[in-house]
Amino acid sequence: MSSRLEKFYKDEVVPALMKQFGYTNPMEVPKLVKVTLNMGVGEAATNKKILENAVGDMTKISGQKPVVTKSRVSVASFKIRDGWPIGCKTTLRRHKMYEFLDRLINISLPRVRDFRGVSGRSFDGRGNFNMGVKEQIIFPEIDFDAVDAIRGMDIAITTTAKTDAEAKALLAAFKFPFRN
């Protein structure tokens, strides 16, 4: 059972990118490897309930239970100790990854207030794309009334592309809303 975006990749994106970049083999075409969601919750050091709510939100958004991240060093100015839980993250692959990206591109990003597109400069030089979301309430799975606090999250999209141009062409072929 493949998702709508996965079928779209095989049927339309692969031939388009083969033509655009002059690939001879379909296996040369860049593809999505994983999507990593990270939610840093600094206030979790003082209140454990905040982290539980963040884990619940991330579970609803991603469809799988996130792992709780712990601090690596003690920082007195942030009032955290080594080993304290300070966030959560999850990695999506295969079907769940395509389902999440489909919801992100077609439902969630258009719900952002004053949305003009994501920056095309957020590539890391090796074909991976990073973006931040300021509010978790843009996702349809989150009930607006049940949210205790507005939290943002980081979204990292890892591809097999060698260059940023290939990765941008791949994401643009998925109808990713780039600003520039």
From Swiss-Prot:
Chaperone is among the record's keywords: no
Gene Ontology biological process terms, A to Z: translation
Cellular component terms (Gene Ontology): ribonucleoprotein complex; ribosome
Domain of life the protein comes from: Bacteria
GO MF annotation list: rRNA binding; structural constituent of ribosome; tRNA binding
SUPFAM superfamilies associated with the record: RL5-like
UniProt keyword list: Ribonucleoprotein, Ribosomal protein, RNA-binding, rRNA-binding, tRNA-binding
Family of this protein: Belongs to the universal ribosomal protein uL5 family.
Subunit and partners: Part of the 50S ribosomal subunit; part of the 5S rRNA/L5/L18/L25 subcomplex. Contacts the 5S rRNA and the P site tRNA. Forms a bridge to the 30S subunit in the 70S ribosome.
Role of this protein: This is one of the proteins that bind and probably mediate the attachment of the 5S RNA into the large ribosomal subunit, where it forms part of the central protuberance. In the 70S ribosome it contacts protein S13 of the 30S subunit (bridge B1b), connecting the 2 subunits; this bridge is implicated in subunit movement. Contacts the P site tRNA; the 5S rRNA and some of its associated proteins might help stabilize positioning of ribosome-bound tRNAs.
HAMAP family membership: Ribosomal_uL5_B (MF_01333_B)
Protein name stated in the entry: Large ribosomal subunit protein uL5
Organism: Stenotrophomonas maltophilia (strain K279a)
Gene that encodes it: rplE
